[in-house]
Amino acid sequence: MVSLRDNIEVQPLSHNKRVRKNFGHINLVADIPNLIEIQKNSYEKNFLQLDTKDSERKNKGLQSILNSIFPISDPSNIANLEFVKYEFDTPKYDVEECTQRSLSYDSALKVTLRLSIWDIDEDTGSREIKGIKEQQVYMGNIPLMTKNGTFIINGTERVVVSQMHRSPGVFFYHDEGKVHSSRKLLYSARVIPYRGSWLDLEFDAKDIIYFRIDRKRKLYATTLLKAIGMSTEEIIKFYYDSVNYKVVKNKGWAVKFMPSHITAHRLTSDLIDADTGNVLLKAGQKITPRLAKKYAGEGLNNILVSHKALIGKYLSEDLKDPESDEILAKIGEMITVELLSVISDLKIKNISVLVINPQSGPYIRNTLFSDKNQDRESALFDIFRVLRPGEPANIEAAESLFYNLFFDPERYDLSEVGRIKMNSRLELNISDETTVLTTDDIKNILRVLVELKDRKGIIDDIDHLGNRRVRSVGELIENQFRIGLVRMEKSVVERMSAGDIDTVMPHDLVNSKILVSVVKEFFSTSQLSQFMDQTNPLSEITHKRRLSALGPGGLSRDRAGFEVRDVHPTHYGRICPIETPEGQNIGLINSMATYARINKHGFIESPYRKVKDGHVTDEVVYLSAIEEGKYKIGQANSKVDKDGILQGEFINCRVEGGNFVMVEPHEVDFIDVTPMQVVSVAASLIPFLENDDANRALMGSNMQRQAVPLIKTDAPFVGTGVEGVVAKDSGASVLALNDGIVEQVDSNRIVIRAIAQKTESAPSVDIYNLLKFQKSNHNTCINQKPLVKVGHYVKKNDIIADGPSTDNGEIALGRNVLVAFLPWNGYNFEDSILISERIVKEDVFTSVHIEEFEVIARDTRLGPEEITRDIPNVSEEALRHLDEVGIIYVGAEVKAGDILVGKVTPKSESPITPEEKLLRAIFGEKAFDVKDSSLHVPSGVSGTVVEVRVFSRRGVEKDQRAIAIEKQQIEKLAKDRDDELEIIEHFVFSWLEKLLVGQVSINGPKTVKTGQTITSEILKGLSKGQLWQFTVEDANVMNEIEQLKGHYDGKKEALNKRFATKVEKLQSGDDLPQGALKVVKVFIATKHKLQPGDKMAGRHGNKGVISRIVPEEDMPFLEDGTVVDIVLNPLGLPSRMNIGQVLETHLGWASVNLAKKIAGLVEEHKTKHASIEKIKKFLIELYGENINHILEKSDEEIISFCNEAAKGVYFATPVFDGAKVEDVKDMLRLAGQDLSGQVKLIDGRTGEYFDRLVTVGQKYLLKLHHLVDNKIHSRSIGPYSLVTQQPLGGKSHFGGQRFGEMECWALQAYGAAYTLQEMLTVKSDDVNGRIKIYDSIVRGENNFESGIPESFNVMIKEFRSLCLNVKLEVTS
């Protein structure tokens, strides 16, 4: 290990960064937001508010739930329990310890509660305080989130997936004509609260309006209006306008002329001006709205209509006799011929009539007259009977039920989002804090529903992202918490009324188990809390950014239709249109787009650049789907000049509804930030995505998540420029916490001296312990390798160590290999892949997989199980890998069947024969009392033991192995402490020397005289402890020395304290499950080399299985002798339409050949001492301006850069903005290659050229998780099914190969009767036949007899269950 004391010069780390030639044309103004902030913000910021002081906590998340549940009072109002504040303890174990010990990473929630007890005067009812007790109460452990946005539950890493659900609010829609045979549209409205009862309002085929509560029996909508306190008159006045008819002597009635109520139609009677008597239009002539407006403009105020025209109109107020005030007809009644004659007899001059015409239908009036309920009371009773059938109704119960349904904040919650949506849809102005329904809401929902029926307005699109919102982790757990606390509230009230309230303390009232069980249940069993996909860093990130429409309160797979699964125009820039699973979950599980974020209301937002008067600014604005509809948004690739002015006469823009229009530059409001914002992280890693068919792009993005981390990683030559971001945000790499200088590096840890802000204070030291060969959730290997050297200066957030599947800080899921597209002897038929032996020989695609095996020694009723080497009837050979305790050594090579941990279990005594008794008496044989229950390596597993962990229960004596492991861990901790102390001391004492030199000593060590000036020679002869003994004349310096000593002592004490705590944790024993005395975990690492049957894929959905490994000498090779690594079938391209892979291959070919060119120039520079300018010129030609920061450095650094580039030139071709065909040709031209990208290939077997030119190039291939080793197995004798007695199937059951129905047909077709009989009987489920055939084989005979198969007996039993007695009569 190297240390900084070896005087190595400090150099910045930045020169390690990889340079890529970028083909992107669009200037990025916004960085990709942190890819896992959706998880962290939701849980830590919004739910727990961990880093916020009590007084500054906002009323959201945990704070809001506790505020809403408390205060809790007892029924008699004597006691009152209030919430004051909450806090969290520091977790007992850190993340790594929790993973190792199979514990949950959580923290104790401590809530401060105040119990007030009141004295109530029985006579006057007045209350006064009797006593107040305040106490901190433990309310259970709450899981904490790790820095990577995951949870550790029982030692496994889990992710809570965000859920897409329908936003609370009101929705209007119709049935699309599906319900009624006439294809008539039946409109309906639905109010969906965040929690509480659903309210539906709907039309039926007869245009009567009904309502339902929670999908129960329907009632008339006017019953609901009456239940909220509206009278018939109020209902009619609210929903209808009225118009006045005045009688005109002997002519008819005069009525106000309203152009707005007129639609184009032919007149049935003359249009007469009532004031002048002029006929404006004759009957039969056509009137239009335009003509009507013209007449109104010319002064037409009233028109004359006949008596007949009033028939069929509805009264807008009660019709009374002018003399007696008697009501002749009620409001809303229809005017009939009889009523009209009464009106003329009584000489009534004025009649007010409802405006009901084609634009305003009579639906509410008709519903009102169908409804039998006349007042509020009868309406409430009606609702009560529907919701509580069979219960006796009284007005109090009915009122209370109706109030609790929609108006009680405890039981009904629209949420702030629901209120905002409701206000905007109904054009109301109710406060956001009102999260229950109001009477205005109900009245206006009905108004909008009727307007829709009258063809005004449009229905809502349920799949619009303005109507779907995301519930993230914080919110999901908040809902669980609320359930737990509501349950707990009931138990608190019970306990308050049960005991003597004066002596009770707050902690006696609270039962935290209720809350804990709810939270625990959510994390371990909820559909949305999932085992993290940890195959590689990309799969982790994608899992955390996933959006699921399934889960509690969501959709179910079977019910989800096509519309929900489909891509919607509002998905643009919010949800990826590409990445979704194939199969039944397609479209229900989505991924967030790269730049998308979730706003405080749960709606997904996408970023846009603001455009002012045709000038594109750098201001980035995030818009939700609702806001976006108001603007015209241009595409990211719209032409812009160097001043940011949009070019061209018209710009193609998106407007509401996903339509595209051409608008002038000054009308554009925003443009996209980058074309990449449309797709998800996985899709943005596919170069030339724009050249692939969408179905294949979907497979490509899904298969990248299945790539296994390889031993040797290799970033893609042809990338997209996003690789670095993914590696950084995934948490696989190690990032520097502070600026600093690397002090020490080895493969296990990196020590960095953080550069302090203030020079006087002692520096802090960051020690990064790297993960070595740890097992991931999917048994892949997590291993971190340092990237820094001693002396490197690192900045905060620099990548200092690579993790699995990362290379130099970029994600590297596969390897760059030389590929040729050509058919080769049929070995690449049907997408098979042919590989060269070099790939196996040089471990190009070799991966390490780690399996964990666990054995538990329990306390049984016959005595404790014991982990030991002393196992009955086991040979010494079988125990060769075990130590004296009975646990395998680290480094042992094991195969299936080997013993990993020796364990014996006591067995019950069986009666002993006299002979055995005698033997025991002679030999003292005790081994009969125990049976062997050792842990063996299961079938199909072999490899090397890489780690052993031993956990002992507290109070159980540790064995030697456990003590040895513990000692090793303590030594590691001590080394960390000593190194940290050494760095601090080095700094402190060199600073102290600086302060002392040149000062006059007043007091000090014996060797220094008083008044002597201190020199560095004097100090060299003193020990470190003696340096602190000086007192100097200068008071300021003395002050500084004291401060420095304070810092030093504080740091030293903190270090020792931390060390002691960790050691104590190690030595104290472990919390093991019930009954377990000792747990041993053994980890076996297996190397998987590439072999036939393994699945491989490119990034373009081009997948295949390896068919054959061909010796290098037989593979096709290039003219310079380079052997091709992989041969793919060219026929896999045309029908699949993923042309991106061809462009990738061509650009990869350019990359290799440019690298050769650079290597040639460097060689020329070394041997012929050619000028470095030639190299610089070539680099500028290749990289453009990207390379300026390299060219400014020294010649040595330029040459070192070229040496890296000589391994392969790296390109970045961002999606939808990458290299075009011309760019690829330019690169091939620069590399001196044929522009077709094809070369002459020579057949390795014959040495002859192939007939045609072949496409060859470097391509990025991945090895997928579907390894043949984990799939293939063979069975000799194994388990049988209990009922049918047929062998089981599948690898996990050690099953056989099923000879199925179709296979039987094949034998029947060949007439192979005996073979068929053998298959159906002795080789399957003829039990007696099986035993006999086994006997005959043992005897060396070859004859057998078929009996009756068990399945025949099963069939007879099934007949009997149908009461058919079938007997089998055997005739001799």
Swiss-Prot record:
Transferase as a keyword?
A: yes
Any Pfam family hit: RNA_pol_Rpb2_45
**Any idea which GO molecular function terms this record carries?**
DNA binding; DNA-directed RNA polymerase activity; ribonucleoside binding
Catalyses: RNA(n) + a ribonucleoside 5'-triphosphate = RNA(n+1) + diphosphate
Q: What is its EC number?
A: 2.7.7.6
Keyword DNA repair part of the UniProt annotation: no
Instruction: Name the GO terms of the biological process aspect.
Output: DNA-templated transcription
Which keywords has UniProt assigned to this entry? Answer: DNA-directed RNA polymerase, Nucleotidyltransferase, Transcription, Transferase
Assigned GO CC terms:
DNA-directed RNA polymerase complex
PROSITE patterns given in the database record: RNA_POL_BETA
Q: Which InterPro entries match?
A: DNA-dir_RNA_pol_bsu_ext_1_sf (IPR042107), DNA-dir_RNA_pol_bsu_external_1 (IPR019462), DNA-dir_RNA_pol_su2 (IPR015712), DNA-dir_RNAP_su2_dom (IPR007120), DNA-dir_RNAP_su2_hyb_sf (IPR037033), RNA_pol_bsu_bac (IPR010243), RNA_pol_bsu_CS (IPR007121), RNA_pol_bsu_protrusion (IPR007644)
* Family, similarity comment: Belongs to the RNA polymerase beta chain family.
Q: Which NCBIfam families match?
A: PRK00405.1, rpoB
Q: Which HAMAP family match?
A: RNApol_bact_RpoB
As for what it does, the entry says: DNA-dependent RNA polymerase catalyzes the transcription of DNA into RNA using the four ribonucleoside triphosphates as substrates.
Q: How does it assemble?
A: The RNAP catalytic core consists of 2 alpha, 1 beta, 1 beta' and 1 omega subunit. When a sigma factor is associated with the core the holoenzyme is formed, which can initiate transcription.
User: What is the name attached to this protein's record?
Assistant: DNA-directed RNA polymerase subunit beta
